[in-house]
Amino acid sequence: APFLASRYDAATGEMIPVARRIGILDRKLRVVSENAVTEDEWRKYATHAVQSTYGYEYQGDNLLLARVNLLLTYAEHLQARWQRKPAKEELQPIANIISWNLWQMDGLHLSVPGGKPQPEAEQLDLFSIFGAAEPQPPTVSCKVKNWRKGSHGTAQNFETIQEGSTSMKFDYVIGNPPYQISDGGAGVSATPIYNRFIEAIKTTHPGAICLIIPAKWYSGGKGLDKFREEMLGDRHISTLVDYSNSLDVFPNVDVAGGVCYFVWKEAYNGKCKYTNYRNGKATTAYRDLNEFQTFIRYPVASEIVKKVKEDGELTLDKVVSSRKPFGLATTAKPMKTGDITLRYNGGRGPYKSTEIRVGTEMIDQWKIIISRLTAEHAGQPAKDGKYRVLSTMELLKPDEICSETYLVAGAFDSKEEATNYMDYLKTQFVRFLILQIAMTQQLSKASFAFVPCQDFSRKWTDKQLFEKYDLSSEEVNYIQGMIKEMA
């Protein structure tokens, strides 16, 4: 209910003084307080203010909180104006109005929310042959009151308010939409659906939208490429508040990549006020969200990436393999005999090179393989707030291959180059750049799009890389404060 009654700061939880509140009902009651001469006059027009404030919510617990906040808002404005608390008999009619004006409704069907009926076996009949539609069970309409009709208002079905219009109009849309639907991948490959809600909401042309959603859309998410492009290019997003660790918002829920909430305003066009919360510290900056094809959540990191990309060097997303580098799934197992060795999630074993159709050019090379899963659970940092990013990393000799469990990070003709490359991947510098894209536990070749390629005939250290890209002491400290050292 913050748009209706802004009693407290949504970020800090602190109460906001009545004079500084900006909710819809707050603004109406402020006008009443500024103009009413007597208490009776104040109560009369304050009642009209409550009567003209409407809203609906799908979830019952959210509805209860909204109703309570509106009632307390009325009481607090009365006390601020007349220096007394309202009596119970004064609050009763206001509570009645609020119970009518804030109601529970399924906005897609304009009906009382109900459980989805169990599917039944379809029985074909004569009429179905000709395309006759079977009757659908009726929905239960929601009733609201028109307080201008009758001494106590007149109840009417909500859909009649639209007066023949086929689309609803909203001042504000606020909520926490469903995040994903399972596609049989145990959550790892579930399909996001919050993007569909946002796209549908925008078609109603509301005055403002405020939704809390997973933050993985910044750089990943199944099927979110078009959505990400549209969001990053949308200059109507006035505010974006980002929590790197979802446990800061939902103490019992790990949301891979963190969560965020944004405010979209139809009347706004400009840079976005972006705030990131990490380890209890807030960082705020006004930013163009589409600086890169993916969104970098940390402003300092954004400046580091700009420096790294200045020279236009080849990046490792052109070097790292795709999934199944040798065409073998995670379930691939060794054979009884073979002329090469398979590295799989259960160890090592023989395999026949004649069975390999993909990546054959790498079989005779020295290869660095890394696990497709990051070292972090659900993308969350360790207790010290630092990230390791890369977990398993191994050197495969010629005639050694791997299953889909791993990515081939690079393949070389000499052991020296491969070893230098492995040391490069272990630097805090490289793993920091990977982290800016790999926000969840899944790694792909795209996760390496910010990592520049080097001359691997020599060894690289963090000190050399910091100097090469002219990073300031503040930027170096920032990287070292975020990324664990790796032996």
Where in the sequence are the language-model features?
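Alpha-helical elements of the RecA-like P-loop NTPase motor core of helicases
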Residues: 64, 419, 477
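C-terminal substrate-recognition regions of SAM-dependent nucleic acid methyltransferases
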Residues: 164, 168, 246-473
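Short, amphipathic C-terminal "tail helix"
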Residues: 474-487
